[in-house]
Amino acid sequence: MMRVLWITNIIFPAPCKELGLPSPVYGGWMLSSLEAIRQLHPVVDFAVATVYRAKEMKTIHTDGVTYYLLPARIDNTRYDKSLEAYWMKVNETFRPDVVHIHGTEYAHGLAFIRACGADNVCVSIQGLVSVIARYYYAGLSFWDILKNITVRDVIRWDTIFQQKRKFEKRGELEKEYLKTVPHIIGRTSWDKAHIWAINPDAEYHFCNETLRPVFYQRKWEYDKCDKHTIFLSQASYPIKGLHKVLEAMPLILRHFPDTKIKIAGPSLVDKPFYRITGYGK
């Protein structure tokens, strides 16, 4: 029986239920992919590992999957050396044939590589922070950013300037991922080009993501759609481009005066003043 270890950025719903935690509202493609693979290849033994805010490691067996929750001492965007011992324990206990790290944006998967090696490891690209960091301001000028700094930004030391720097630091860790692993999974010519530039010796595998079931249950129909609506799946920071959509709205409204913008997720502005970000302002 093949043994596959997934390293993810979220806690899956099953262990969330065991721990009394709210289930994540994002990353649904990973759950759908896990369910689809288990149906197609029931002989594969799966384990899913991630980090959580706690003091001890937990192992949960449910629905035929083993879940490992590793205690994180620091913010997951920074490297946590204490995770290396836990990863060695997971590796020795589960003995995976293949390790699949979902995403290179966070540092906990890199701790596995440093502790256990990369010979049987592949990573899949969810976004390349080392590249995105270059464009983090997304056309905002120095003055645009400076004049909109809020109380929340100052207290948390989290202006758009600092956010860009954090992306750059995460990008340094991401490049170590990509330079080390022999196999990389992606789905666009954009990520393939950047992977080749960083590690031309890695073997690139094209693979589209599996969406949540709801995306396959209904079809878009013009007669039933909310016409002249622009939908943004995220808008919490500059690279998602909300400010560019707003800049374009006068031109759009000239031709389609009933145009609406809908944004998924929490409001950027409907909150106390001390919680509004500079970008939300």
Which residues make up each language-model segment?
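N-terminal subdomain of nucleotide-sugar transferases
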Residues: 1-55, 61-66, 252
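Active-site proximal beta-strand in glycosyltransferases
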Residues: 4-7, 98, 115-156, 185, ...
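Conserved donor-binding/catalytic core segment of Leloir-type glycosyltransferases
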Residues: 5, 221-240, 246-249, 261-262
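Short hydrophobic signal-anchor/transmembrane segments that target glycosyltransferases
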Residues: 40, 115, 243-257
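Short N-terminal targeting/anchoring amphipathic segment
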Residues: 90-106, 112, 120-122
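Membrane-proximal helix-turn-helix segments that form the acceptor-binding/catalytic region
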Residues: 145-184, 193, 197
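Acidic anion/phosphate-binding donor-loop and adjacent secondary structure
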Residues: 196, 210-227
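A conserved nucleotide-sugar
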Residues: 249-281
